[in-house]
């Protein structure tokens, strides 16, 4: 524990410098050691070389409302950096995704997947754009390090190419099933959950997700109903919540609570986004007014 704390303090010295006095550094260090205060757990984990390479790994929580195909890779990248990712598959977002063209039989040259976070994300974006355009592409995974290989910077062990292969095959299947149409909210949710399932290192779950959906989205309401973990196990990586901004009727709320009870999973939750303005911290409100 003391080594972890010292690594964190050392990294913060690199960035904060003399903005804190030696007495303040010592006070912060002691507070963390005694667990009286706690900094970002992600930064506690990745302070040092990992955070120097990309400071995204320092953040506990992130959020993406997918409205373009690149957003799926953004969610993947954030998850691979160890961040928790919230996403909204509300119809107002998913309906902005383009219409899927019917397959033309045209095939692109084989794409070699690079052995990096960016390489995996680029492969996903290429696949989605290709399938949306009515074309197809084959991927070469020969550059991806094998399962069990040591991850020197982030720690842990590599999962090998199989999770990415499964993700790309699954995404292709869901996209091609909607040729001539658009992805449904449940389709987008499932692809993102499959991304979460893909982001695994050495058998350790590194994905934390929350999915927001429309209150009247019945498919999302029933996404974790019954033995979903047998038919759609990837859905386990995300907690699901319905979101509303205008007060629902008693009947609407009762429908949601009954569905939650019958699901057996305790989901979906319900999130009152309309009340956020009343609970927004003044310091944050003042900050956003400045920028």
Locate each region found by the language model.
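Extended catalytic cores of very large enzyme megasubunits
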Residues: 1-291
């Amino acid at each position: 524990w003391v080594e972890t704390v010292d690594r964190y303090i050392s990294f913060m010295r690199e960035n904060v410098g003399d903005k804190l006095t030696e007495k303040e550094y010592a006070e912060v260090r002691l507070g963390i050691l005694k667990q009286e205060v706690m900094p970002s757990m992600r930064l506690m984990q990745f302070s040092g070389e990992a955070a120097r390479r990309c400071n995204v790994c320092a953040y506990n929580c992130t959020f993406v409302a997918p409205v373009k195909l690149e957003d799926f890779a953004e969610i993947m990248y954030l998850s691979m950096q160890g961040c928790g990712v919230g996403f909204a598959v509300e119809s107002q977002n998913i309906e902005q995704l383009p219409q899927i063209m019917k397959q033309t039989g045209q095939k692109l040259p084989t794409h070699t997947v690079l052995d990096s976070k960016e390489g995996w994300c680029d492969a996903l974006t290429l696949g989605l754009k290709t399938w949306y355009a009515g074309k197809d592409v084959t991927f070469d995974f020969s550059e991806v390090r094998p399962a069990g290989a040591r991850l020197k910077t982030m720690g842990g062990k590599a999962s090998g190419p199989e999770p990415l292969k499964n993700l790309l095959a699954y995404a292709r299947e869901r996209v091609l099933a909607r040729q001539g149409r658009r992805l449904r909210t449940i389709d987008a949710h499932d692809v993102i959950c499959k991304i979460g399932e893909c982001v695994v290192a050495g058998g350790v779950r590194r994905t934390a997700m929350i999915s927001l959906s429309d209150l009247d989205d019945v498919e999302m309401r029933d996404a974790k109903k019954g033995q979903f973990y047998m038919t759609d196990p990837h859905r386990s990586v995300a907690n699901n919540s319905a979101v509303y901004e205008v007060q629902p009727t008693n009947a609407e709320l009762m429908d949601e609570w009954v569905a939650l009870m019958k699901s057996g999973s305790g989901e979906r939750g319900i999130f009152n986004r309309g009340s956020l303005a009343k609970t927004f911290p003044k310091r944050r409100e003042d900050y956003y007014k400045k920028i």
